[in-house]
Amino acid sequence: QKDSLKIRSIFFLVGNMADKYSLIPTNEQDPFHSIILNNHIKETEDARLPGKSRIGMALDSLYKSGVNAPKPQSIRDIEVVTGDFLIKNVEAAFTIWQRSKKLTKCSFDDFCEYILPYRIENEPLSDWREQAYHKYSCLLDSIDDPIELAKAVIRVSGLKYNDGMNKYPFLPTFSELDHLHWGSCKHLATY
């Protein structure tokens, strides 16, 4: 039974892969990406306010200096996702689903729609699920309520809203956000 559900999960992912892709910087030296990755910018609590984010000011200065907004490279999942990546993702998704049954009684269809996907939007492919599980699985043992679990993840993560991150032209990966501790509303929602 479980193996047949896993096989159906693989078919679900492959069947929905045609329009999935990553948008990544065209080169590793992209100045917009470098600002985020190097993160030597120290923010204050005011970063949540428009015009107060130092990251936002740094990104603005790039735009004003004539640096063209980056044209991201599109990489189609169908061309790069491997069988091993899918199997690893399905196994990890099933672990979460089985472990979190106490949180929500979701059907297999809901599992496929909300738990199984290996990406949120067009962020670079990553092992975000494994990283998140490693960091937050201990919370699954102690918190039964999904809303309280979400609040605990936010508290433990240390992530904060940063208005300037709205100007960042790429979607950060889980590990990039975990390193930054700052993100736009969209970034925080996908974290």
What are these regions (language model features)?
Residues 3-26, 30-179:
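Secondary-structure boundary elements
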